[in-house]
Amino acid sequence: MSNYWLNIYKPGGISSAKLVSMVKQILGKKVKVGHAGTLDVEAEGILPIAVGEATKLIQLLIDSRKTYIFTIKFGLQTDSGDYTGTVIATKNYIPSQEEAYTVCSKFIGKVTQIPPAFSALKVNGVRAYKFAREGKEVELKPRNITIYNLKCLNFDKKNAIAIYYTECSKGTYIRTLAEDLALSLQSLGFVIELRRTQVGIFKAENAIRIKSPDEITKSFLEEKSIKIEAILDDILVLDATDSQAQQIKYGQKCIFDYEDDISLLWVRYKGTLLAIGSLNKNCFNSLRVFNVL
């Protein structure tokens, strides 16, 4: 089995790229490996890793909903939005428990967010955080995101901290959300702990934890692998005949006996993922074709 997903739990203190490198070291240098969504170095949590042909589906997973649990420290603001940064502002006001809980409703729905300067977004081909580290100002464009759920799990007035849970769309920066929450509460705040608990179908409770490539074998990862089609379970699937499979493989016109137009579906051949694409007037238009024939 060479095309699959791995549900990996990234510990804090290492980069997403480093974790991918560790997996590649275990599986072999020739194996194609990629991850579905960068996590901050100091953050921990779910980092889905695609192996082989699964890398062609990474964007679909990046587009899926994600859940996080994060802790805000009130009364201070840092340049990075988390505890690794330098304090740039302070405010004595600490919100009440009631305020910390009720503010959540203001953020549920479509929200405009300005990404933090300390982010991996590129500005003129250079990562924004590189400019930020040099003390240079970077203008990042606001982006539209969606907060599907936001709630306060715990509030500690004495230590001026609150723990929140959120379910959000792609492109959401939790550090920015935390700062905006604090500002809405007439205070300041930054993230002192961040954990991603779910990405699409991948959840923290059944994730693989890797501390060192020396302690995990290739066979162990393969045993824990998740089929490539798993992330497509809620998408329409059509079964291809031998002739249809050949047409799709070679980029030829392929007609299916299906009345509705479909913006995204996948085609299965002999029980295996063959392609993803759309259907327009019975004609299948491939977005990605997988090397399974």
From Swiss-Prot:
One of the GO BP terms on file: mRNA pseudouridine synthesis
Listed EC numbers: 5.4.99.25
InterPro entries: PsdUridine_synth_cat_dom_sf, PsdUridine_synth_N, tRNA_psdUridine_synth_TruB, TruB_C
GO terms assigned for molecular function: RNA binding; tRNA pseudouridine(55) synthase activity
Keyword set includes DNA-binding: no
Catalytic activity as recorded in UniProt: uridine(55) in tRNA = pseudouridine(55) in tRNA
Catalytic EC class: isomerase
Keywords: Isomerase, tRNA processing
Pfam families: TruB_C_2, TruB_N
Residue numbers annotated as active site: D40
UniProt family annotation: Belongs to the pseudouridine synthase TruB family. Type 1 subfamily.
Task performed by this protein: Responsible for synthesis of pseudouridine from uracil-55 in the psi GC loop of transfer RNAs.
Family matches, as NCBIfam families: TruB
Name under which the protein is recorded: tRNA pseudouridine synthase B
Gene that specifies this protein: truB
